[in-house]
Amino acid sequence: MTLILDSGGVSALAGQRARLAELRRRELWRRELWPAQVPAVVLTGVFTGDHWRDFHVNRLLRMCQILGVDEQLARNAALLRTRSGRAATIAATDAIVAALAVGQADPIVLTSDPDDLAALVADHSASVAIARA
């Protein structure tokens, strides 16, 4: 299984009190879902540019795998977004998260946009579990 975080997932895990966040990460590790994967484009939605305010996000991301977005992933994301019928209302970042997920074995996406992610993967043959952040 692979855990993939969008900006809502990163914010949810980074925003918890330190002890609670550590317990949650240990449980994810025990279930072989850690380290989580985060597409690099997601970082634009979680960073403020203020190193003090970004402290908890930086701490969390040091424990994650940050993945680059290549041309093929971007094309796959665009296709998912178009096929959803909601390309005008679904963020490109969410489409990239969805495209990454459908390429993984047993993916789980932790997101604050479960409806958008569900629409993106609805017509795809891959099974993607979506969890609300």
Q: Where are these predicted regions, by residue range?
A:
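Short, well-structured N-terminal submotif of metal-dependent ribonuclease cores
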Residues: 1-38, 47-65, 125
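A generic structural signal for short hydrophobic patches within well-formed alpha-helices
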Residues: 10-11, 43-46, 74, 117
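Short, function-defining helix-loop hinge/capping sites that tune catalysis or transport
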Residues: 14-16, 102, 121
